[in-house]
Amino acid sequence: MSGLILDSGAVSYFADASADYARAVMAVFGSEDLWPPRVPSVVLVECLTGHPQKDARTHMFLKGCDVTTILTESAARRAARLRTLAGRGSAVDAALVALAEPRGLIITSDKQDLTALAANAMGVTIEVI
């Protein structure tokens, strides 16, 4: 998948950020040809509540993202391997890192697990929002 990928913390952060700040960040990533970001559908499990009113801002933000619904068997196997090598991290985090290969950028609010998973990945960079 590579490119710019957002985890649940980053989705929630951008959804709650001020409109001016969000537009500024989008402009920066857009100038680097990294916008719109990709959001694997499994991330929605962590950033949505199932309550329409509580999720309204997140749904609005996600309309501007490329929500990816495919986790192939090979990506799932790669995620399992990365998780085993790291000895930590959730299945969702491992899937994000596997999908970011090669040379992808993941924006997160929780750097520890993703950094451990990315240590064995091909050129995946983790940045904290």
Residue ranges and their predicted role:
Residues 41-45, 94-97:
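Non-catalytic, well-ordered alpha-helical scaffold segments
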Residues 44-48, 80:
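Amphipathic alpha-helical segments within well-ordered protein domains
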